[in-house]
Amino acid sequence: MPVKEKVGIVVSNKMQKTIVVKVESRYSHPIYSKTMTKTRKYLAHDEMGECNIGDQVLVQECRPLSKRKRWTLSKVLSKSSLVS
């Protein structure tokens, strides 16, 4: 079975070795046919602490690392222009 991957934007990096990634998915409403955007936040493991807020990242599913953390940082796709 292939590993699940998601692309999202880092919204928080205040925890040690953990980032919060916002992933948006678009779908069509079954009755009204309006395009809706669903946003979900995932906790991901960032071993080296290389991510900053606003970075676009690729995360992969992995074994449970804690109660809510089941994703790991695969790579940083683009760095944010915001400097913290």
From Swiss-Prot:
One of its GO terms (cellular component) is ribonucleoprotein complex. It is found in: Plastid, Chloroplast. The keyword Ribonucleoprotein applies. GO terms for molecular function: rRNA binding; structural constituent of ribosome. InterPro entries: NA-bd_OB-fold, Ribosomal_uS17, Ribosomal_uS17_bact/chlr, Ribosomal_uS17_CS. The keyword Transferase does not apply. Keywords: Chloroplast, Plastid, Ribonucleoprotein, Ribosomal protein, RNA-binding, rRNA-binding. GO terms for biological process: translation. It comes from the Eukaryota. Its main location: plastid. Transmembrane segments: none annotated. CDD domains: Ribosomal_uS17. One of the primary rRNA binding proteins, it binds specifically to the 5'-end of 16S ribosomal RNA. Part of the 30S ribosomal subunit. Belongs to the universal ribosomal protein uS17 family. This is Small ribosomal subunit protein uS17c. The gene is rps17.
